[in-house]
């Protein structure tokens, strides 16, 4: 988390302040009620004077954000309807910019422009400085619930972007990235299937099969299940060297991946 204004660092350092600011930013330009603050900060065990503590934290947060000023009217954090609201203008919050680039990248993919769409999705993903959001701020139930769909959306966008890049014949460039992504989630079938295909197309059949066995083991141990039929078919095709797994001969193929037709986003 970082907050800057005209080059000045206004980032709060105390955990409660950071957590409150994160909740306000995740609900930018919307009222966060006192009940929401109490639930986020203390979950199911609020102290007797939780409401008073929230008021104190807000007062301190205002001073930090406003460079030591105490007047409510001089800043963006304002009192509204038994709660507080943080005003954020267009282009100020990186999350909003990320989501805008994500939508634009997906639109390009949908329009049949895999190269431009993949590049824009890569630009969006490069905005993340860590593997997950809010790595340096405490998260309670409300922040965890708000972050979950963002994380899912990011993973789905990554799958779509890699799908486009595989269709453009960039399998060798993708191997290292896919290895890292699969390492973060050993049970993710779509990413493992993409890794298997990239490895196979790079002349690494044995490594592609090893990736399948790691997936099967992780699914059995963690989820008590097995890989789906599409991953099994891909494995069979790798063993037999099916022609449909060959890399494209042109960078202008449609956005389909015959090797794993139902594992990638449409």
Where are the language model's segments positioned?
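Short amphipathic alpha-helical recognition elements used for nucleic-acid or partner binding
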Residues: 9-41, 61, 187-195
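Intrinsically disordered, charged and Pro/Gly-enriched terminal/linker segments
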Residues: 10, 26, 46-50, 74, ...
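DNA-recognition element of transcription regulators
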Residues: 14-22, 47-68
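DNA-binding alpha-helical recognition surfaces that contact promoter or target DNA
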Residues: 39, 56, 63, 210, ...
